Design a protein with these regions (language model features):
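Flexible, glycine-rich terminal cap/loop adjacent to redox cofactors
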Residues: 3-11, 23-139
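Short linear capping/connector segments at secondary-structure termini
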Residues: 15-21
Length: 139
């Protein structure tokens, strides 16, 4: 926007995989495809979820929790969506948007060393698939 309006340089904006956040309590952050969108686009979709109470909530006595979900095209192993509800969701999804935009794979996430103790470490330690959707060949 700034380059186009103030720098007088037209910039083509890529509207795919733009992160979005809702600054409610708890925050909601999302980037990429939803499960439904991925299922419509890909033959096999894997979903990884983590629901937990972050350490800072535990230490402070807060009951707040975080839900994270990765949506993966199983055919390419590419992470095509990430959805987070909880503290710092906007900050987390902004960074994950880089990985989604770069077409990072679930294996890339798995190979990333986790920074402990953070909520973000859940994104690279989700090893157990929680759902797999296989499109009916007749559909």
């Amino acid at each position: 926007f700034a380059d186009t309006v103030f720098g007088k340089r037209a910039v083509k904006v890529d509207h795919i995989d733009i992160p979005t956040a809702v600054f409610t309590q708890p925050q909601v952050g999302t980037v990429g495809l939803t499960e439904a969108q991925a299922r419509a686009q890909f033959a096999i979709v894997d979903v990884y979820k983590a629901a937990f109470r972050p350490l800072k909530a535990t230490l402070s006595g807060s009951e707040s929790r975080v839900l994270m979900k990765l949506v993966v095209d199983a055919g390419s192993d590419r992470v095509v969506g990430c959805h987070i509800v909880g503290s710092d969701a906007a900050e987390l999804v902004q960074v994950i948007a880089i990985a989604v935009k770069m077409k990072a794979t679930k294996a890339d996430f798995d190979a990333t060393m986790a920074l402990h103790p953070t909520s973000a470490e859940e994104l690279v330690t989700m090893r157990t698939r929680t759902a797999r959707y296989v499109r009916d060949a007749a559909a």
